[in-house]
A protein has these predicted regions:
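Two-component/phosphorelay signaling modules centered on CheY-like receiver
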Residues: 11-30
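Acidic, metal-coordinating helix/loop segments flanking the phosphotransfer/catalytic sites
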Residues: 31-48
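Acidic catalytic/metal-coordinating carboxylates
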Residues: 34, 59-62
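Active-site residues of response regulator receiver
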Residues: 52
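The feature encodes the CheY-like receiver
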Residues: 56
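Alpha4 helix (beta4-alpha4-beta5 surface) of REC/receiver domains from two-component response regulators
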Residues: 62, 84-101, 111
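Hydrophobic/aromatic residues positioned on beta-strands within the core alpha/beta folds
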Residues: 79-81
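C-terminal output helix
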Residues: 104-115
């Protein structure tokens, strides 16, 4: 079974590019445009989350804190991304594994995703 990646991003362009690239790489992808939309998908169990910080109905940092404090999701890697936030401030606000400043190099992002998904199995994917 392919790895599932959950993307919480309100910017359609960024969301579509990430989704297209990840699907091309063989991953399954679920996209969410708002915090509320994300929170209603409790049945989903992604292998990695990519979260934007600034969202129309909330804050990705708060979502990250929630994910990292839940026993069900605390071990799932999180990549935070933002065009505006200070990366050091983001690091102290939640326990995400990676922080990416927008705009970002899509291939560097893919490399981070592969590393996080395969950190326990370097020969996977």
């Amino acid at each position: 079974m392919n790895k599932l990646i959950g993307i919480l991003e309100d910017d359609e362009g960024i969301r579509d590019i990430l989704q297209f690239l990840l699907l091309e790489e063989g991953y399954e992808v679920e996209c969410y445009t708002t915090v509320n939309n994300f929170l209603t998908k409790k049945d989903s169990n992604p292998d990695l989350f990519i979260l934007d910080v600034m969202l129309p109905d909330g804050n990705g940092l708060e979502v990250c804190k929630m994910l990292k404090s839940s026993p069900k999701t605390s071990a799932i890697p999180v990549i935070m991304m933002s065009a505006h936030a200070d990366l050091q401030q983001m690091n102290s606000a939640c326990r995400a594994e990676e922080f990416v400043k927008k705009p970002f190099d899509i291939f560097a992002m893919l490399e981070k995703i592969v590393q996080l998904l395969n950190k326990d199995n370097p020969l996977a994917h």
